[in-house]
Regions:
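C-terminal alpha-helical interaction module
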Residues: 1-324
Length: 324
């Protein structure tokens, strides 16, 4: 998948991402600066200052696209969209008629994302990941942790964002954090723990935790419309990117094959409701998910891409039966 070692790109993996029992361990994000409304962090929330590098296939990047849409920040934060599938040089930005939703990098002219990392730290060692948040004023990457980026987009751009909805309200934060921890470990990252496991035991441990949690979420969504409280919150937007990728990628490629999201009535209808929130459909690209995931050599060495994309998120949902 590729990494930078002392600023040099190498087509290899970080050895520490596999534990002693063969389990997948995700490396921590390395850039962790924070944008603040008042600029006290050194990075003030300003329209036109920040630029996102993303890929439609990546669920972590999808989080930031969701927040850019629901907070109506499209005019304030520019985006470069990578071509699906990790190339020899990693995430790549270019015009390609086969992928009309992908773009060159119009801010810096970087062809590969790793160029942004070495422009920020010439001796950088580690993974090169999306989303990556670039500050035009200082000319460097400031954050590549999706959970932190969406919090900034939610709370620090007041007066710049076109929508002031708070998806992390103070009264619900403790429960949102609890659900986030559960969903991240067993579902968001859980599908990767299944797909990238190197031993049968590691795979089965991740598989069992994944479906136990999906069963729990299915039951929870049978009692209430959203994961926390009576409104859409950060917890919902963090689960959604995994749900829309599950049936077209994780179910088969990552061997998460006990059942599909389509086989969970509550999760299915919940996913459709979130998809139908204004602005969200434009962030969902199922064909790109297929191409992106099935291009991962470690799980699909043949490189053959499935032809079909059998999903329809636009069908009507039944979530209005539950009180909001």
């Amino acid at each position: 998948m590729g990494v930078l070692i002392e600023g040099v790109w190498r087509d290899e993996e970080l050895p520490q991402e596999t534990g002693r029992a063969g389990e997948f361990r995700r490396a921590d994000s390395r850039f962790r600066e924070r944008i603040t409304a008042d600029g006290s962090s050194g990075f003030k929330a300003e329209g036109g200052r920040y630029h996102l590098y993303v890929a439609h296939g990546c669920p972590w990047a999808h989080r930031t696209l969701i927040y850019r849409a629901v907070k109506k920040l499209e005019g304030a934060i520019t985006v470069a969209y990578a071509i699906p599938g990790l190339k020899e040089q990693g995430w790549t930005f270019d015009s390609n008629p086969a992928f009309p939703d992908c773009t060159p990098d119009t801010v810096n002219g970087f062809h590969h994302l790793h160029q942004a990392y070495t422009a920020s730290n010439p001796r950088y060692t580690g993974k090169v990941t999306v989303p990556t948040l670039w500050d035009r004023k200082s000319g460097r990457v400031i954050n590549n942790e999706s959970s932190e980026i969406i919090r900034m987009l939610n709370s620090e751009f007041k007066g710049i964002a076109g929508d002031d909805t708070d998806f992390y309200p103070p009264a619900l934060r403790a429960e949102i954090d609890r659900i986030n921890d559960l969903v991240y470990g067993n579902v968001n990252n859980g599908v990767y723990r299944c797909g990238f496991a190197r031993t049968q035991q590691a795979y089965e441990t991740a598989y069992d935790a994944l479906f136990a949690t999906l069963d729990e979420l299915e039951a929870r969504l049978g009692r209430q419309r959203y994961l926390v409280g009576r409104q859409i919150t950060e917890a919902d937007w963090r689960l959604f990117p995994t749900l829309v990728r599950f049936d077209v990628a994780y179910f088969s490629l990552f061997k998460c094959n006990r059942q599909r999201i389509a086989d969970y009535p509550n999760l299915l209808n919940y996913m459709r409701e979130l998809y139908q929130v204004p602005g969200i459909a434009a962030t969902v690209k199922p064909r790109y998910y297929v191409i992106n995931y099935w291009s991962i050599k470690r799980v699909n060495p043949s490189g053959i891409i499935p032809k079909g994309t059998p999903v329809d998120f636009a069908q009507s949902h039944d979530r209005t039966r539950l009180a909001a």
